């Protein structure tokens, strides 16, 4: 293999990786991994129970759904537009023996049909993305579904619980709820 072949191969790999990262950013948010201690805080705040179904919008490397399936014995489903992260997350799920309770689907957050199954929906997206998703969440989620967002809010949903230190916001799927609580 010549030097030019190596350079062209490296450039091709770089372009593929850059394109997948850009695609994820255009369709929801760039990937910013959530530390496990915040993942644990998210799942506690959402009051996730064994056997419930969690849908993580923008699952990234799958750490939240893996934690939900492993530690909470929940049925955890990820939605991810980045094919490499989706592949990696499903590889980790397989490696950890969690395939019966966890899976990441390669689909856009705007096109997923998984929301009606969710008891809990989690999202760490951008403010503009949350605003675009509000109508879909209100139409497709069960009225009892709990929605937890990190950092960015859903402006037309009333916050039920708020953790200002970690910037976590808990909602129910019904618009116009009035009960509020600050942790």
Which residues are covered by each model-predicted region?
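C-terminal substrate-binding/active-site "lid" region of AdoMet-derived donor-dependent transferases
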Residues: 128-183
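Conserved SAM-binding motif I beta-strand of class I
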Residues: 75-80
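S-adenosyl-L-methionine
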Residues: 1-49, 87-116
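A short SAM/SAH-binding and catalytic strip from SAM-dependent methyltransferases
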Residues: 118-132
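Conserved SAM-binding loop of SAM-dependent methyltransferases across substrates and taxa
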Residues: 63-72
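Conserved class I S-adenosyl-L-methionine
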Residues: 51-60
């Amino acid at each position: 293999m010549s030097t030019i072949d190596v350079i062209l191969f490296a450039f091709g790999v770089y372009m593929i990786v850059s394109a997948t990262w850009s695609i994820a950013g255009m369709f929801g948010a760039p990937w910013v991994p959530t530390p496990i201690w915040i993942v644990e805080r998210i799942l506690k705040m959402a009051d996730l129970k064994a056997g419930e179904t969690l849908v993580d919008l923008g699952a990234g490397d799958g750490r939240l759904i893996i934690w939900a399936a492993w530690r909470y014995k929940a049925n955890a489903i990820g939605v991810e537009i980045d094919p490499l992260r989706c592949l990696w997350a499903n590889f980790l799920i397989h490696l950890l023996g969690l395939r019966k309770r966890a899976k990441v689907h390669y689909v856009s957050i705007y096109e997923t049909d998984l929301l009606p199954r969710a008891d809990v929906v989690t999202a760490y997206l951008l403010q503009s993305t949350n605003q675009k998703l509000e109508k879909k969440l209100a139409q497709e989620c069960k009225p009892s579904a709990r929605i937890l967002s990190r950092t960015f809010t859903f402006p037309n949903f009333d916050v039920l619980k708020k953790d200002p230190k970690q910037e976590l916001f808990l909602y129910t799927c019904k618009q116009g709820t009035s009960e509020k609580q600050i942790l």
